[in-house]
A protein has these predicted regions:
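Metal-dependent phosphohydrolase cores
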Residues: 1-168
Length: 168
């Protein structure tokens, strides 16, 4: 069963899945299931969350929802450990925010053809922490949705544990 955080919809049964079905089963994307992300989720689940909600918002505003879904799924397609990278960082070395965006973009381009729009979305999803500014409306949307999903991934499990503790 494939779902986004705070959604009850089965994602394999709707138009969203048509946009990402060729990517989601790939070995590289599936590897993300083994990496913890934002404390209580996996990098795979985070990417699905960003992908799905970016798709929904872009569709609502009649923007390129297909590219948003694809870029959202691939925006964190990197495999190094962020904590190790930051601990061993030397002067002049790119920040994690910049490095992982560029690495995810390179990995995405190895996996599939990415459009200029998708490249902008993946490379700049950490704006304003990184430069330059996004070129497209869809890039601003994925940037906002990425932060929104990070907050949900951090807070929702805590709220669920709190509620479960109250009902005992």
């Amino acid at each position: 069963m494939l779902k986004a955080i705070c959604s009850s919809k089965e994602l394999t049964d709707n138009s969203y899945y048509d946009c990402v079905s060729d990517l989601i089963g790939s070995e590289q994307v599936q590897e993300l299931k083994n990496i913890t992300h934002h404390v209580s989720t996996t990098r795979f689940q985070h990417c699905v969350n960003v992908s799905y909600y970016s798709y929904i918002v872009c569709r609502k505003f009649k923007l390129n929802a297909r590219s948003a879904a694809r870029a959202g799924l691939l925006h964190d397609l990197f495999f190094y450990d962020r904590k190790e990278y930051n601990a061993s960082k030397i002067k002049g070395q790119a920040s994690h925010s910049k490095k992982h965006s560029m690495e995810a973009c390179a990995n995405a381009a190895e996996l599939t053809h990415i459009t200029c729009l998708e490249r902008d979305m993946i490379e700049k999803h950490m704006w304003p922490a990184t430069r330059p500014m996004p070129r497209y409306k869809e890039t601003y949307i994925i940037t906002i949705i990425d932060k929104y999903c990070a907050v949900l991934e951090f807070c929702v499990p805590r709220v669920q544990r709190f509620i479960a503790g109250k009902t005992r």
